[in-house]
Amino acid sequence: MNAYQKTIGRAVTLSGVGIHGGAPASARLLPADADTGILFQRSDIKDSAPVCAHVSQIGATDLCTSLGAREARIDTVEHLMAAISALGIDNLVVEIEGPEVPILDGTSARFIEAVDSVGVVTQDAKRRFIRILKTVRVEAGNSWGEFRPYDGTRFEVEIDFECPLIGRQKFAHDVDEETFRKELSTARTFGFMKDVERLWAAGLALGASLDNSLVIGDDNSIVNADGLRFKDEFVRHKTLDAVGDLALAGLPFIGCFSSYRGGHRLNSEAVKALLSDETAFEIIEA
């Protein structure tokens, strides 16, 4: 457990396209002072106010996690937030050119590479953590998510698809920086060809391609020539998403998060439920 807050050594920029709109997008990561937190700002909108990376600022959870509202909304923050959280970075300003964080390769790997290229700086202020004190559970149909006390930071994510290629998969592991780098960071976002074609027809997912998505064909086979990176790559990516979504609690947590057939909306609802119950957690200093 890192005792002191961290930021990055210097600014670094990543460029690509937005997966939903298909337009050019870039993210410029800048160092920030201790106790700043993670701030997003639209650099393409004059006098745009910074938006705190916090669950209270979530604007939408359809297909991705979005922060802010209306014309200043920022979509698809989860892969970047997962990398930031896993690397133990507490303070950062993220300037976004366009309405989306670039999808890059559909994972967190490129964001980690960018941070590695500029280094991480330890700051004078102590880190704070959310320690889970009791179980908090949310349900939606046959899906559920819950926090419970645990001495560490653990994710237990289970998915269940009718598609035989995916089926029922579970990833259960304590997640620290090393685990995230090796087991989760390169797991790709995924989708079904029939859904991608439907989204394209509706003017959505215009930036989706085999370069940034794992695609399942109508015959339940992998369309990508390189196949799967892990036999359970699907649930690993869902866990990556959960790491990013739960980072919007505002502080790293000590406890276990479990989910069944979850997604961005369920993840955010679980965080909201936790933070709304003051008896369910305490803030501690490292």
UniProtKB/Swiss-Prot annotation:
Belongs to the LpxC family. Its EC number is 3.5.1.108. One of its GO terms (biological process) is lipid A biosynthetic process. The keyword Cell inner membrane does not apply. Keywords: Hydrolase, Lipid A biosynthesis, Lipid biosynthesis, Lipid metabolism, Metal-binding, Zinc. One of its GO terms (molecular function) is metal ion binding. GO terms for cellular component: membrane. The active site is at residue 264. The keyword Zinc applies. It is an enzyme of class 3 (hydrolase). Its cofactor is Zn(2+). Pathway: Glycolipid biosynthesis; lipid IV(A) biosynthesis; lipid IV(A) from (3R)-3-hydroxytetradecanoyl-[acyl-carrier-protein] and UDP-N-acetyl-alpha-D-glucosamine: step 2/6. The lineage of its organism: Bacteria, Pseudomonadati, Pseudomonadota, Alphaproteobacteria, Hyphomicrobiales. Zn(2+) binds at residues 79, 237, 241. It catalyses: a UDP-3-O-[(3R)-3-hydroxyacyl]-N-acetyl-alpha-D-glucosamine + H2O = a UDP-3-O-[(3R)-3-hydroxyacyl]-alpha-D-glucosamine + acetate. Catalyzes the hydrolysis of UDP-3-O-myristoyl-N-acetylglucosamine to form UDP-3-O-myristoylglucosamine and acetate, the committed step in lipid A biosynthesis. This is UDP-3-O-acyl-N-acetylglucosamine deacetylase. Disulfide bonds: none annotated. HAMAP family: LpxC (MF_00388).
